[in-house]
């Protein structure tokens, strides 16, 4: 089983102590986002957790506790863009905090365990194609020694993102603009020996040498863990998504990064209310189990292929 921690919220930044408590207890409770009264109990013991993918914009709260992950195979999806505080309202200084934390994380765990994400890309009067290219190059120069690749994507429109981003006056991206950005980013990435891929994009950028990313990546885990995994593509993701199956242990409306483009937060009020219900000792990310809730233990097993090959 692979754990996603989490597409729905920034666990390393805001819930790292809770997460380490869950590892000590070796289980976590997760509400079904489609039915909040259904709660899954997930085994977090190393014997069944084959890997953990952390999604974050700021891993600083975890940096002094990485040794507590030594029994697990893991890597980070680390989003670092060129947007300012009017877009990513809750992040600390990128030059003083975020970029140094990226570099430190890579030094401590290795560059193959830190994937840079520059996404989502959108355009307006300030954030033009030239702006993105200029600052993508700046970031690439600082991050290339500390990662193997960069994954990019273009902004997807959801009801809550359209509402939240209205003050930014976004210009819809045309296919030609996407291709222009891809072509220019590829040249920059090549300059710094970075592999470039895209996350769940419907357009084919193969002629630029850019393929679909596998953000929850079977091959990366096999390299890190030196094992073979019998895991299938995640059927719950879009067709263009290359991710393999995983269990997400986060919750929507809990991330305090304040990114206006975020699909996982519906309102700042909901985020604040849910964060106020966070308990470090609770098996749930926020709130508690109520009488009307039904808790069911998920049947999970290790997906590592234990059979010896002919050549082993």
What are these regions (language model features)?
Residues 239, 247-267:
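Local cysteine-cluster metal-coordination motifs and their immediate loop/turn environment
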Residues 176-242:
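A C-terminal junction/extension of Radical SAM enzymes
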Residues 97-164, 183-200:
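Conserved C-terminal portion of the radical SAM core fold
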Residues 8-10, 57, 79-83, 119-121, ...:
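Active-site beta-loop-alpha junctions enriched in small/polar residues
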